[in-house]
């Protein structure tokens, strides 16, 4: 198989070229938001570093964009919370920060690997809804990796069913699930 992004094959690119694609063209949201964030840095430091690494902006512009992303993802009092550390946020709020981080460099694709597994059931639907909304607003496609068929049925247009590392079935959600 091949992995194509915007018509370019990326599965055989050298490490250095992939480094430029990761973050800039592809963002990621992982299972556990606590391990996705560095506990030694504020969420603002992490967001602004990502923004400045991938976009030609000043530190002030990066901070303004970071606050805007936190607001977009539903972090209350984002201008103050930007200076907080990951441990000062709840699990759901940390996952919102991770989603903001994934969107920081305006990627074309967000890979969301079980983004709600580590969260309370009451927060899971909010996070899936948020991910869908902000990706639509920012023009990013989402590749959702999950075992939750309910989430797939409610969220996805197309689905690929994997078995033993291979695609066993692929197609529109309503056809594959039925």
Would you name each region that the model predicts?
Residues 1-9:
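Conserved ABC transporter NBD signature motif
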Residues 104-108:
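A short, proline-enriched helix->beta-strand linker immediately N-terminal to the Walker B motif
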Residues 125-139, 150:
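Helical segment within the ABC ATPase nucleotide-binding domain
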Residues 10-27, 45, 53, 175-178:
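ABC ATPase NBD coupling module
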Residues 152-154:
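A short, surface-exposed alpha-helical micro-motif characterized by mixed small hydrophobic
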Residues 158, 170:
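Short, glycine/charged-rich "phosphate-handling" switch motifs in NTP-dependent
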């Amino acid at each position: 198989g091949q992995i194509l992004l915007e018509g370019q094959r990326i599965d055989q690119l050298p490490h250095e070229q992939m480094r430029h694609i990761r973050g800039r063209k592809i963002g990621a949201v992982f299972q556990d938001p606590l391990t996705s964030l560095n506990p030694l840095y504020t969420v603002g430091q992490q967001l602004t570093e990502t923004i400045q690494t991938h976009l030609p902006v000043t530190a002030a512009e990066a901070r303004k964009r970071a606050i805007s992303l936190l607001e977009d993802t539903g972090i209350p009092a984002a201008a103050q919370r930007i200076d907080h550390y990951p441990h000062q946020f709840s699990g759901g709020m940390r996952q919102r920060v991770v989603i903001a981080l994934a969107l920081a460099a305006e990627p074309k694709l967000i890979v969301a690997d079980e983004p709600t597994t580590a969260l309370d059931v009451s927060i899971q639907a909010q996070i899936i809804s948020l991910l869908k909304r902000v990706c639509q607003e920012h023009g990013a496609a989402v590749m959702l990796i999950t075992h939750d068929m309910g989430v797939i049925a409610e969220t996805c247009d197309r689905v690929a069913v994997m078995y033993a590392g291979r695609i066993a079935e692929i197609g529109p959600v309503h056809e594959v699930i039925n």
